[in-house]
């Protein structure tokens, strides 16, 4: 597999949201706006790339019996660094995303890539895999958030462009499920045509 294919695989064929249906908790809860979706996606991307690099580097030295707890400690370390950075430089976004930032530690996307890819491959390939999956997750959350924001409040990335208030249901839980469901259908229909 080429380096380019490693990245595009996580974007399309193994998209964590629309194909693998992973990370549903942050997907449904944080995508009330495009900015929130983008921010959560970038936070997860940061942790994915760095944890994949670290886990790939230490994997040969980690005994099989304790590899999952070790991976969780590595992931938790990067999440803690992310929390400190967000608190220092983007306190408003940190407050908005709240509990979902520390929950990246147990996000099945991050742990799944560590277990399925990073511990069996080299550092560069693991970084590219994390980048591809992270970009796929970021793109998914941003698109879901953008659609929900447009339909729910008539704005995009915080800029109001439609008159009125929009359809309130789209910024609430039912809207999250509707938008996610329709996008999953469209995405998978697109994949089957290829």
Which residue stretches match the model-derived regions?
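N-terminal membrane topogenic signal
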Residues: 7-18
């Amino acid at each position: 597999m080429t380096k380019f294919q490693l990245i595009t695989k996580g974007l399309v064929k193994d998209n964590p949201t629309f194909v693998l249906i992973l990370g549903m908790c942050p997907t449904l809860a944080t995508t009330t706006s495009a900015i929130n979706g983008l921010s959560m996606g970038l936070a997860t991307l940061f942790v994915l790339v760095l944890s994949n690099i670290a886990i790939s580097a230490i994997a040969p030295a980690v005994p099989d019996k304790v590899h999952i707890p070790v991976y969780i400690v590595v992931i938790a370390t990067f999440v803690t660094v992310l929390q400190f950075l967000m608190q220092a430089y983007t306190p408003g976004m940190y407050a908005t995303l709240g509990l979902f930032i520390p929950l990246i530690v147990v996000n099945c996307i991050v742990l799944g890539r560590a277990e399925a890819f990073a511990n069996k491959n080299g550092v560069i390939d693991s970084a590219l895999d994390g980048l591809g999956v992270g970009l796929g997750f970021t793109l998914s959350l941003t698109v879901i958030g953008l659609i929900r924001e447009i339909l729910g409040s008539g704005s995009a990335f915080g800029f109001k462009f439609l008159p009125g208030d929009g359809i309130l249901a789209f910024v609430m839980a039912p809207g999250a499920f509707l938008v996610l469901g329709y996008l999953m259908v469209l995405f998978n229909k697109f994949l089957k045509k290829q």
